[in-house]
Amino acid sequence: VADVHFNPNVADVAALYCEKVRINPGNYVDPARKFIKQEYTDEEYAHELKKIEERFVPFLNICKENHTAIRIGVNHGSLSDRIRNRYGDTPEGIVESCLEFLRICKKENFHDVVISIKSSNTVVMVRSMRLLVEEMEKEGMNYPLHLGVTEAGEGEDGRIKSAVGIGALLADGIGDTVRVSLSEEPAAEIPVARHLVDYIGKKQGHLLIPAAAYPGFDWL
């Protein structure tokens, strides 16, 4: 997965060679946050959305031609000034930041999409994901969701924080893939993720869909 920030041109190139490209709605077209307070009229706001669409659609076309999937990965800490000025630093703003791009994907009939919404604040992360599921259902969208808590830390604290955020959503039946992020060796993250998934899988009504490696996948 190519993780691209700040430069949509890099995302275009990455889509030619990578199986999946992650973009961050907060800095894909909107400039980096400067914490500037600016009120947008509805007309001005619509113009900004049009700029996103004009830049995002060519990227989707490259992905279509090369069978490249994308992940729309929203970070609580990198919401654009435009979103923050209209919605504040809220779950509603986080969700709208994601939906702006999802609506374009739906309009362009592009569905090789995975979504992630991450925050170091587990309350914000859980509320945002629950709200996103509600809004997607209203708009007839159904995309896989990737769960994770950023900056969870290490040791017992990091494991508890990950369990609170990811576990709460899995218990709701929300989430298709998970990533536990610890400030430790990457191998230490895997047992924690497996334990969470196994625990939820044992609960009544939470049947897991087992993952299988693609036959032609080269693990090297």
Residue ranges and their predicted role:
Residues 42-52, 84-220:
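Catalytic alpha/beta core domains of metabolic enzymes, predominantly
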